[in-house]
């Protein structure tokens, strides 16, 4: 999508924010898993559009022991290859730095993946294989 001017960008952002809030409000009225799944997919798309992301994921714990994660929902922009099938039962040992931050309820923001190559080598490798350059 080619944006012509700043006003158009603000309109897109405003519409995406409205969609995000609307999808969140619908969660209180969900009657079954299929409906929840549809709302989550719409919400991920709106978040992707709002942030300009290529992909938006949701991960859940794979086991009660919380030793691995699986990608349960994914939205991808046009012409972006889905990774959901490759992101199943990922051992938390592949992301030790992130797990510490998650436990402290910290947000992870990576503006430039290459800047994490030496400080977070495990996470770097995990993201590099998916051709991810930045992450929130």
Whereabouts are the PLM-identified features?
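A short, aliphatic-rich beta-strand micro-motif
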Residues: 133-136
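Per-ARNT-Sim (PAS) sensory domains and their PAS-associated C-terminal
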Residues: 68, 129-131
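Short, conserved clusters of charged catalytic residues that mark active-site
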Residues: 38-43, 93, 118-122
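Signal-transmission linkers at sensory-effector interfaces
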Residues: 1-39, 49
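Terminal output helix/cap of sensory domains in signal transduction proteins
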Residues: 98-99, 124-127
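Short regulatory alpha-helical segment in sensory/regulatory domains of signaling proteins that mediates
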Residues: 25-35, 43-52, 60-63, 127-128
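GAF sensory/regulatory domain recognition
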Residues: 57-105
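Soluble sensory domains of the PAS superfamily and closely related sensory modules
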Residues: 99-108, 115-119
């Amino acid at each position: 999508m080619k944006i012509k001017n700043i006003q158009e960008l603000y309109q897109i952002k405003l519409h995406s924010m409205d969609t995000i809030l609307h999808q969140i409000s619908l969660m209180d009225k969900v009657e079954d898993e299929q409906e929840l799944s549809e709302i989550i997919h719409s919400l991920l798309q709106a978040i992707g559009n709002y942030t300009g992301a290529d992909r938006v994921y949701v991960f859940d714990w794979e086991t009660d022991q919380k030793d691995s994660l699986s990608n349960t929902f994914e939205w991808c922009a046009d012409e972006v290859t889905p990774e959901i099938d490759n992101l199943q039962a990922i051992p938390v040992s592949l992301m030790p730095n992130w797990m510490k931050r998650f436990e402290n309820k910290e947000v992870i923001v990576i503006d430039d993946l290459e800047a994490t190559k030496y400080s977070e080598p495990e996470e770097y490798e995990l993201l590099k294989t998916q051709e991810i350059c930045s992450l929130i």
